[in-house]
Every structure is written in C-alpha cells, then in structure tokens.
Regions:
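Phosphate- and divalent-cation-binding pockets in alpha/beta enzyme and binding domains
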Residues: 65-70, 90, 136, 207-209
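Short internal beta-strands
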Residues: 21, 77-88, 151-155, 199-202
Length: 214
C-alpha cells in the first residue's frame, strides 16, 4: 500500500502501461487502512488493559515494524518484546534508514524493544513466524496461550498452517492489519493512471483475464 506508516513509497501517478498487475489482496473488504488501524488499536488496547501479554506473530520483514510504530505512538508506556529476528529487523531499520518514511525515522530510533526470552507478565510480544511453521514457535505459542496470554493474527492464515488451526480452535484472534489494497483503492489507482490492461492480483473476490500474449 502507498499509505505505509513506516516505509517510504513512490506513488504511481499519471503512468502509462500496456499491462499493470496490481495488488488487490483485500478484494471486496470495504474497510480503509485508517479504519483497520483504528480497529487494531482498539482491540489491542482492550487486550493489554486485561493485564496479560499479547503475542503478535509477524513476517520476518514487513508489517511488524508498522505495528511497532503504531503501538508505541498510541501506547508509549506498554512494554515491547521481540525475538532475535525482530530485533535484527529493527536494528537494520535504525541504521539503514533509506527505506523508512521521514516521520518514522525518529520514532523507530527511540523505541525500546526487549529480547523475547520467555513469557512476560504483560506487554506486546513480536514473534517472527506468522504461520507458526517451526516447532519452536509452535511450542512458544502454546505456552503463551496456556499462561493466559492472547495470540493475535494480523495477516492471512495459510490453509493447513498451525496458525489456522489455532484460529479454528478459538485460541488465536484475527485482526487484519493493512498492508495491501482493497478494491476501492485498486480502482482509485486505475483512475489516477493510464493502464490499458489492469489485472487485480491476489484476490478471490473478482477476476480478470490472466493470459498474457507477446
């Protein structure tokens, strides 16, 4: 999405192309990025107010830093923990800031994230394995749940994944965090450019002819 809170983006405007493959992963979901972020913060506030820790399984790179920046801005006193990969990602962002949006550079430099070495009494915990594919992260998530903590999925669970099974069992909550476009944003991008043949990508809600002939 062009509306990242952390990453620098180059908006596509007045561009001509014969073929444009455009992200539309959220399809018919009408909620804007602003609404999704508000819903995310509202629910996270309620979970943290309960006095138990919250586990956020996130990709090795990407939305984790966005969620960190948003949560630290909204709840600056909340303790934050991250596994080794998350700390590596944060250290990279703090030193190589070329990819960061100007308003995120200072906030990510000042933020304090403690190593996630166990299950804390409270706070936000980032775990760099969204589908919980490794035995270690599965074991950690199970122990987290057994200790009374909340586990929140913010991306799309893969079919057959451990995260999907936790959601089916009611042990993992789902809060979509915006990193892709919906159909409204996809159509807006079309209006602001000149694409002869646009193809909406990554959505089951509607389709377009996908055969490409040269």
């Amino acid at each position: 999405t062009e509306r990242s809170l952390v990453y620098e983006t180059d908006p596509i405007r007045r561009t001509r192309a014969e073929l444009a493959v455009i992200d539309c992963a959220y399809g018919a979901d009408p909620r804007s990025a602003e609404v999704l972020r508000f819903d995310f913060l509202t629910r996270m506030a309620a979970l943290l107010a309960a006095g138990k820790p919250v586990l956020l399984p996130v990709p090795k790179y990407g939305r984790g830093l966005e969620q960190l920046a948003l949560l630290c801005r909204a709840r600056p006193k909340a303790a934050v923990f991250g596994d080794a990969q998350f700390l590596y990602q944060l250290a990279w962002a703090q030193t190589d800031r070329f990819w960061l949006a100007p308003n995120a550079r200072d906030s990510l430099t000042r933020v304090q994230v403690q190593p996630l070495t166990g299950i804390p009494d409270s706070g936000v915990c980032f775990l760099s394995d969204p589908q919980l594919k490794s035995p270690g992260t599965r074991k950690f998530a199970d122990a987290f749940i057994a200790a009374g903590g909340s586990v929140v999925m913010t991306g799309t669970p893969e079919r057959g994944s451990y995260s999907a099974s936790l959601m089916q069992d009611g042990k993992m909550e789902y809060l979509r965090y915006p990193v892709h476009q919906n159909e409204t944003e996809y159509r807006r991008l079309l209006r602001e450019n000149h694409f002869s043949r646009p193809i909406p990508y990554h959505t089951p809600d509607f389709s377009a002819k996908r055969e490409i002939l040269f």
